[in-house]
Every structure is written in structure tokens, then in C-alpha cells.
């Protein structure tokens, strides 16, 4: 399976890192593109340094992909993900900022993440948007509805608590397992009614 992962400036970097691990474990081919704000959030939430240089941040992030991922610059309009003729099975934006969601809902594009999501929608391919922000304004809700009606799946980065998590990593894994389910990828996470 070939998956595009866009990382934007919303909080939720641990979800992106764990998703990379899950995709790599499933032998997926992964293209990663992080926005400028996404790099800052990755640096802050994963590595404790919002000023970590872009290249170092991405190199450290890719350690989670175990060699299965390739990085693309947000300004790379010639990347395969910018074309509907490229064979890509699924597109995920995790985390997805409300600014990115609004851009997608309007059909505008200013970087590779926006373009890749637009390609997914126009080609009828799987697109999963993972917002985290709360509370939500009426504009946020309308943008989510617009994106969903255009074909995107909205998967909020909100863990359940019924599985008895003992730590934050288990809460992250809960959400990532739901995300992998959306992509049709098998995982080891327990399901409802399992122990």
C-alpha cells in the first residue's frame, strides 16, 4: 500500500510518529510532507525543541518509519502526490490544522499537502483528515462537513478511555489503531470486547 502523510501545524505530533510506525510495520510505501508549522510542532512535541532545524526534525521523525518513508518539501509541486495519474492508495493529514481543513474545504491550494488532498478528492481516493483542535467554531464545523461531503473521512484525534489505558502512549495507540482501520491495515490493538 502507498500512503501520503501530510503533517500540519496542529498539536498531535505523537499521532503522526506512531502512524509512521504502524504504516512501516505494514510494509507500506510512505511519502511524508510537513508544513513549516508542522515542523515546529514536531520539534516541540516529539523532541522538546521548537527551533530544531527542519532537516534534523524530519530525520528524527523518519526514524519512526524504519526506512519506509521519503520526505517531500511542501513547495514540491512536481512530486508524484501532486498528480492524479500517480498510483497512491490513501492520503492522511495527521494532525490536520483547522487552517488546512479550511483550505481544503474551499478548494484552494498553496502547498503539496493541499494539492495531494485535492488529488485524493478529485480521484475518489481515500483521504483521512485528523483534526485535534477544540472547541470548534461554526466555521470549523462547516469546513469539516464540506470536506466530508466531498469524500474525506474526518477522524478526530480523540482517544477513548474504555480500553483501560495506563499511559499516554496507549491513548495515542488507540487513535492510531482507528486510523489504520480506516486505511484497511491490520494491527495488534485490542478491539471492543477483547482483552
For the regions a language model picked out, list residue spans one by one:
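A cross-family phosphate/adenosyl-ligand binding-site feature
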Residues: 1-127, 135-195
